[in-house]
Amino acid sequence: MDTILSPRTTTGSTAPLRTGAEYLRAIADDGRRVYVDGELVRDVTRHPAFREGARSIARLYDMAADPANRERLTYASPADGAPVLRAYQIPRTHADIRAKRLAAEAWAEATFGLMGRTPDHVAGFFAGYAAKPSVFAAGGQQFADNVVRFYEKLRDNHLYASYAIVPPQIDRSKPAHQQSDPSLYAGVVREKDGGIVVRGAQQLATGGVFSDYLYLSCIHPLQPGDENYAIGVAIPMNAPGLKLLSRRGFAAKAENAFDYPLTSRFDETDSLVVLDDVFVPWEDVFIYRNTQICFDQWWKTPSHVYGNLQAQARYATKLRFLLGLAKRMNEATGHDKNPPVMVQMGELASLATIVDSMVQAQEVMAKVEDDGVLWPSRNTLYSVMALQSEINPRMIDIVREITGAGMITLPSSERDFENPEIAADLDRFLGTPKQAARDKVALMKLAWDFIGTEFGNRHQQYEKFYGGASFLVKMNVFRNYDFDRATGLVDAALSLPPLAAE
Ligand SMILES: Cc1cc2nc3c(=O)[nH]c(=O)nc-3n(C[C@H](O)[C@H](O)[C@H](O)COP(=O)(O)OP(=O)(O)OC[C@H]3O[C@@H](n4cnc5c(N)ncnc54)[C@H](O)[C@@H]3O)c2cc1C
């Protein structure tokens, strides 16, 4: 199908909560152009690289549509009181922020923290934009109206947006407009009746192949001359001219769910976005040729903190899963009560607890900034994000250390258990007094899929970079830390009264 089929939407009233089946129908064979292994994928819900990832997202929609989860995963739309995803809630009280975190945790638990860009991530960014439309109005009131209308459309139709907000790594030594070809980085190339035309590429749309909409913008600092790249626009994933060039689809290479229990189910995929003269109607343009607003959207609205509150709740959940894996592996190897291993487990638990506590501190230290909207604590958020690129590899390394060869001394695949010539050997030498060989192998394969497979290693890169390079996050902490209070202490120490004897 080559026509644009926008996801089924309602205007003016809230659609019934979307089920998983409705979500899958909406993205199936809708004309989106996804490329993997040299092939154009017509239907991501059927292709082996994407099918199970799409079903994992569908399960999240089913959870939210289940009346048993109404309070945890939804809230009443301000439009008409009907339930909508809590990720779209604009928090006004501490209880609201807590409720948003609990919703994010519920979905993160369902994916073991292994899918970062689920529909609740970019939802947080749009909630942040709608909380502070005045930032967009600086370019003209119509842009503020557009972003609020689009937010309401996402919210009231339970839609899934992904984003690509980083220019491709072509030549980082030059600004956007001085690249060898001015249409390498995604930007506007001309206006056309009723809208604008966008051309170029942007990285890296995690979950893009599964989403309804792409938000295309730029978080990298732009310079004078870069105005054409200073845009913020929403594009349906099946818009003509939009192509998603997926990285290797790990799930397609995962032979079965026993050997690759995580790869086979939770590969959210990452895609380079290519725009071949994509037309965007004015109503889906929120920022137009304005470098200041392009910058301010991240830092002068609560978008970045709402989106990353979800990201951190997801990460804390993933670390809890890692702790569980390590504990079960120690039980399997007989090291669980070995004091040096207990010390290492204590270090792991400390690091996981720091992350978890920092997520909760974002709520506790949240403040109403203006417009009656609550912002999670930026300093707390950015501090834990800044240390993530050190904490994460440290934790993975400890788990590698305590496991020895446990994740490697494994049958080559599930099929080895079916060969009578070796099945008895596997049962005898891989089992433990408490655990049948097959159960122990399943556990170790689960851990290896988390840590050592291509899927596991991509996750380590993801945790390093999903919130931007760590030097940038540290700059955020620098900008937000209360240095006045710190230097005040130094000044007080320097002006202490003389000692009695002096
Ligand atoms: C798995 C994964 C998923 C992602 N998902 C998304 C997504 O969904 N949407 C999206 O928009 N983006 C996504 N990203 C992209 C991510 O936002 C970028 O990778 C990130 O912003 C870093 O940019 P870069 O990769 O271009 O690195 P660069 O900006 O090129 O930097 C690379 C390295 O160079 C060094 N460096 C560069 N400049 C400096 C400097 N001034 N000072 C000190 N050191 C410097 C640092 O070591 C830095 O880490 C994802 C990335 C990964 C790896």
Regions from the language model: what does each represent?
Residues 1-75:
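Acidic/polar, glycine-rich intrinsically disordered N-terminal extensions of enzymes
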Residues 51, 55, 152-155, 317-320, ...:
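Generic structural signal for well-ordered, non-transmembrane alpha-helical segments
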Residues 75-213, 218-233, 238, 243:
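Glycine-rich flavin
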Residues 166, 331, 357-364, 393-400, ...:
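Charged/polar positions within long, soluble alpha-helices
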Residues 168-314, 478-502:
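FAD-binding core of flavoproteins
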Residues 310-368:
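Extended amphipathic alpha-helical segments enriched in small hydrophobics
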Residues 339-346, 374-382:
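Short, charged, amphipathic alpha-helical segments
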Residues 379-502:
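Alpha-helix capping/hinge segments and adjacent helical runs
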